[in-house]
């Protein structure tokens, strides 16, 4: 039986997994006053309890009061959003597929426990590989596809806009460009639809000869490899993705109908079906309201198709290992 969305507006967010990403997400949620209630769940209960104490001690400096506590899966019943940031870390010598196999098993246990509570809200997936784990979460939960969302390429898109803003010396808020596809090496920028203000990027380059089209490829290479560089320098990425997750959460709780490149299921859009992948989508309190199907040029369409095929191939491989994915 498919559950219908709850009409209650408790603005309760449950964070499952408070490693670097989960704890940074909780911290950013409180700092921005997005949620009224924040529940922390982690297999390491001492760590979760410590995070709650640390966060609560900063309540006097937050823009609004957030009720924060160390909870359990029963607290998911009244949650509007459950964010899963739990999972195994990739070890030296492990492949992406090795990591996926471990995290699928973890996610099955987590999602089953959440659903057993009577959860009736929206799943927000942060753990990598996020597109495939978002798909797994939907299968395990049985929730409507629009109510299971992954962080997708929201951070990649933010990185692209930041770097383009630096290059053109324009506020990143007025650079409109998307990164779509897998959150990973097969992601691609949509240069053909990018604009500076309301001016198409291609026209802006023609009007400003100081900027070179060839530089765009270097900029995207830096976007694509940013996570690797940050991991090399500090061991992990967590501030940027935490802020991306908060932005998605705000769109969900505040019913913003905001456009973001989240991981969601396609049903013919962009020529793809039965795959969870990052594309521009309208996000509101019910999850993904609509996928915005942009017109891609031939090169972009080919790259997007390759990204889809890569994800589907990995999906098939996991299916063959015996996981009910």
UniProtKB/Swiss-Prot annotation:
Q: What does this protein do?
A: Catalyzes the conversion of lactate to pyruvate.
Specify the superkingdom.
Bacteria
Q: Which protein is depicted?
A: L-lactate dehydrogenase
Its EC top class is oxidoreductase
Q: Which GO terms describe its biological process?
A: glycolytic process; lactate metabolic process
So what family is this one in?
Belongs to the LDH/MDH superfamily. LDH family.
| Positions of substrate binding | 90, 96, 128-131, 156-159, 237
Q: Any idea where this protein resides?
A: Cytoplasm
Please give the NCBIfam families that the UniProt record associates with this protein.
Answer: L-LDH-NAD, PRK00066.1, PRK06223.1
Q: Which GO terms describe its cellular component?
A: cytoplasm
Complexes and interactors: Homotetramer.
Q: Which residues does the record list as Phosphotyrosine (modified residue)?
A: 228
The protein's matches in Pfam families, at most eight in alphabetical order, are given as: Ldh_1_C (PF02866), Ldh_1_N (PF00056)
Gene transcribed to yield this protein: ldh
Pathway connected to this protein:
Fermentation; pyruvate fermentation to lactate; (S)-lactate from pyruvate: step 1/1
Alphabetical list of HAMAP family matching this protein: Lactate_dehydrog
Tell me the organism. Shouchella clausii (strain KSM-K16)
